[in-house]
Swiss-Prot record:
Homotetramer. This is Argininosuccinate synthase. Its EC number is 6.3.4.5. The lineage of its organism: Bacteria, Bacillati, Bacillota, Bacilli, Lactobacillales. CDD domains: ASS. It is found in: Cytoplasm. Keywords: Amino-acid biosynthesis, Arginine biosynthesis, ATP-binding, Cytoplasm, Ligase, Nucleotide-binding. PROSITE patterns: ARGININOSUCCIN_SYN_1, ARGININOSUCCIN_SYN_2.
Amino acid sequence: MGNKKIVLAYSGGLDTSVAVKWLTDKGFDVIAACMDVGEGKDLNFIHDKALQVGAVESVVLNCKAEFAEIFVGAALKGNLMYENKYPLVSALSRPLIAKKLVEVAKEKGATAIAHGCTGKGNDQVRFEVAIHSLAPELEVIAPVREWHWAREEEIEYANQNGVPIPADLDNPYSIDMNLWGRAIEAGVLENPWNTCPEDAFFMINSVEDAPNEPEFIEVEFKEGLPIALNGKIMELHEIIKEVNIIAGKHGVGRIDHIENRLVGIKSREFYECPAAITLLKAHKDLEDLTFVRELAHFKPVLENELANLIYNGLWFNPATKALIAYLDETQKVVNGIVRIKLYKGLATPIGRKSTNSLYSEKLATYTAADEFDQAAAVGFIKLWGLPTQVNAQVNLK
């Protein structure tokens, strides 16, 4: 009888490369699976390295389009920002990666899935809750959480077992990147008083180094999602990639966040999210133009709840599904074009138009073209203030 098969979420880094050997020693045939969500890595190198370190099979999946349309799409429709600051960069990719791991496991006849998360972060929760939501029968193993090695012990194990040490191992920062942004933590950033060194940034110029002239872009939306950039129809993942470059050049999207983690601790995180910040601002601006007042005031309440659900690893929870369905309904009128000024760290919507616009210049103007019936205000004010007036008459004696 052969070894049991296990699918490992493989990144090509030291932790998951050592995990291949560690799991093999535990009696598993390791199938390495790498999901491309736009991190910009050399996927051929990762594919080959997995086999080099002992995986019996290496699978690389291009998930950029699905990640953008389904997961980032929900974040855009919902203007999602955890604690009003973090655009859910890593939190959005984890359910997709978990879904693909389950699909590979079922296709290959694996009985278990492994990931490279520590026992201290949010991602262990996100992966395991998602996997068990989709395939409760699969065992989940977290080698890094189990072996409790210091970095030096891990390197020693790698050297003893012929696992290549990555060239960038001395990088003082822990990095996670996808299409929607880049997360930076550890090193000197663990002291919240310290300023983030410039060498930590990859996507975004400093404000000082940003161009001295503004740049203007136009983003067209259809039912809440971008479909064109500067008049050119593009796939969503292509628009995000392009806006990352343009907005990053102008210093847009650096975030310094003291974050309340799901596991109960505070962490200090830096994020680079040029496209996320730019497109979220444009999207919200278009909603302001096309939403009735009641929807504009109520939707943010549910946005906050949905951001918390996704951050906390509950993408496949029925509550998340219901809230995303609500978002989809609201977005039917979010069609139009937003013009954005990019300059010295700011993404500022400066123009917008829509066939679903509820803005009436004839009602808003103070010129002779005004069609607003000001005489109607007298009766409106009387009825609107009646409960307050009655309260005063009864209680202010």
